[in-house]
């Protein structure tokens, strides 16, 4: 029997008590009242938060309009979003899809983390956890495989699930106001939403993506966003409305991709500054390569603190501060997981070489990680009490039990369905 010490019960593992199995299986029957309960957290109907319109020229537009929460996504928003995509993909009148945020402050700040954590604290067996991750991860796979042009206008904060909604799409438009980050280690989870797959295809054999995922580094320079591959086109914010209008009024041909590429080329430009991360690439690759353990990464960064180059010292100091904010267990898990995905990239027979395979594995990890005490503690310290002083368990990387980390990757128990994508 595999038991994760910090979990209050034995869920999701191949072997556990039949009594609990029966109880947990019952909780997976997701009722209307469950949906209403989760929706109530948002304070308004999903139709107010996710708006969909199809314009006469065949351009469909999704607008995330939950401004007070920086367009953070909850379960019903996920479901509504995917229903639009599914409907439009089979509608011959729809030629492409644009997604945007309702405010220049944010495209999407991520998942409604406080709502999920609150439900877990009320009931560790809540079916909402499984439903939220199922909705998110199937939506990500749908975006990545979307048959029609998918254009993300990533103006403002684009973090966590915001990168999931945009980073797997074909066209990723950034502005000088775009702020990109995966800060999940800082709340006791791990960088999910398929970011490990994006990271594996980043410069330096995936080391740049691993660096961003482990440290939670915020990318605000357009040149860096383009260098990493998180953005495909830089459009100054003063031109964004004109770009949108040009697409909404365009006479799209039988090959809308060609028309969209031409329009994006017209409004996009090269950032004024060079990519800072590009100049740091040798150091990032050395410290965050897939063959380095998290302990070795930290030791490497400490060596760089003694560099004669001030820019390298500054980078190393910042990276270490970023790592210090993460839960030790999360850091250990993230390094191992990202390394596995990066190493699988060149091995087609490996399930982790595909996004769908990555998301199936990620689903197992997410369901289990969300029930660890670190998640509730991280949300408390960062988002609720805001004392920025989480009490992690374990308290150091040296105390992390590798067997506990390995257990997160194992197939789910027969009573809990694997992700279907």
Curated annotation (Swiss-Prot):
Molecular function (Gene Ontology), one example: 3-hydroxyisobutyryl-CoA hydrolase activity
Entry-annotated residues carrying N-acetylalanine: 42
Keywords, comma-separated and alphabetical: Acetylation, Hydrolase, Mitochondrion, Transit peptide
Pfam families per UniProt: ECH_2
Class of this enzyme: hydrolase
InterPro entries per the UniProt record, alphabetical: ClpP/crotonase-like_dom_sf, ECH_dom, HIBYL-CoA-H
Any Gene Ontology CC annotation: cytosol
Sequence similarity: Belongs to the enoyl-CoA hydratase/isomerase family.
Protein name per the record: 3-hydroxyisobutyryl-CoA hydrolase-like protein 3, mitochondrial
Species in which this protein is naturally found: Arabidopsis thaliana
Lineage: Eukaryota, Viridiplantae, Streptophyta, Embryophyta, Tracheophyta
């Amino acid at each position: 029997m595999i038991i994760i010490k910090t979990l209050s019960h034995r869920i999701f593992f191949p072997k556990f008590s039949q009594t609990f199995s029966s109880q947990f299986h019952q909780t997976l029957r997701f009722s209307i009242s469950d949906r209403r309960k989760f929706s109530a957290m948002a304070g308004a109907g999903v139709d107010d938060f996710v708006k969909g319109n199809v314009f006469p020229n065949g351009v469909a537009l999704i607008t995330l309009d939950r401004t007070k929460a920086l367009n953070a996504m909850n379960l019903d928003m996920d479901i509504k979003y995917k229903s639009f995509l599914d409907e439009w993909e089979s509608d011959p009148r729809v030629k492409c899809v644009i997604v945007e945020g309702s405010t220049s402050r944010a495209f999407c700040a991520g998942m409604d983390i406080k709502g999920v954590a609150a439900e877990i604290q009320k009931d560790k067996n809540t079916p909402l956890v499984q439903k939220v991750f199922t909705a998110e991860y199937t939506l990500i796979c749908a975006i990545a495989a979307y048959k029609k042009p998918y254009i993300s206008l990533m103006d403002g904060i684009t973090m966590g699930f915001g990168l999931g909604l945009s980073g797997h799409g074909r066209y990723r438009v950034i502005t000088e106001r775009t702020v990109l980050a995966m800060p999940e280690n800082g709340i006791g989870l791990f960088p999910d939403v398929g970011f490990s797959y994006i990271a594996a295809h980043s410069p330096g054999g995936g080391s740049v993506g691993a660096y961003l995922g482990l440290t939670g580094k915020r990318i605000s320079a357009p040149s860096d966003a383009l260098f990493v591959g998180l953005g495909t086109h830089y459009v100054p914010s003063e031109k964004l409305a004109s770009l949108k209008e040009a697409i909404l009024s365009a006479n799209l041909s039988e090959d809308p991709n060609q028309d969209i590429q031409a329009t994006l080329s017209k409004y996009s430009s090269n950032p004024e500054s060079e990519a800072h991360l590009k100049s740091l690439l040798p150091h990032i690759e050395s410290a965050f390569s897939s063959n380095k353990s998290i302990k070795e990464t930290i030791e490497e960064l400490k060596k760089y603190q003694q560099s004669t180059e001030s820019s390298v010292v500054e980078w190393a100091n910042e990276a270490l501060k970023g790592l210090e904010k993460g839960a030790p267990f999360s850091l250990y898990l993230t390094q191992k997981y990202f390394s596995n995905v990066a190493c699988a990239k060149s091995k087609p027979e490996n399930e982790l070489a595909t996004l769908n395979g990555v998301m199936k594995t990620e689903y197992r990890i997410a369901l289990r990680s969300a029930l660890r005490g670190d998640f509730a503690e991280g949300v408390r310290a960062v988002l609720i009490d805001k004392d920025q002083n989480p009490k992690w368990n374990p308290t150091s990387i040296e105390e992390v039990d590798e067997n506990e980390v390995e257990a997160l990757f194992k197939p789910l128990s027969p009573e809990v369905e694997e992700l279907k994508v």
